[in-house]
Amino acid sequence: MTNIPVSKNRSWIAHLHKGIDQMDGRSKAAIMRPAGVACASDLLSLCEKYLGKKVDSLENLVTGWNLVREGRHLTGRWVIEGSSITGVFSECGCPLVRSGLIELHPVQCYCSQGLMETIFSRAAGKPVQVEIKRSIGRGDEVCEFSIKL
């Protein structure tokens, strides 16, 4: 099998994103959220590695995720405020974007939303709602997410 250059993969995914972007918001989310669900277990494992124990609460998840971000020199953090959790970040948190494997595109934010819904719901023991308030991928200066418990 021939090795395909990263640039070819990046181009192919960019065109896929462009096609998905032609759809309505509900369809975009339906396609991209499952990709984030697939990444949730990887992030949960990282949080547990940095914590040195299983994530068994929202507090542990927030602490672990903030430790992961600090360990990777990423700015911004998660904060628990009553019945919601807010995160404001200065860069896209997607490791595929940060590594250069894919280019940042607005539809990627639905992927992040799926990841957050999965990981926060698991830690909360119930479904949560994730609102994308601002997004670098959509032209804002920061990414801001609100988790409604």
Question: Can you say where each PLM-predicted feature lies in the sequence?
Answer:
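N-terminal accessory segment detector
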Residues: M1-V107, V128-I136, D140, L149
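Active-site helix/loop of acyl-thioester processing domains in fatty-acid/polyketide metabolism
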Residues: V107-G125
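Conserved SAM-binding loop
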Residues: F145
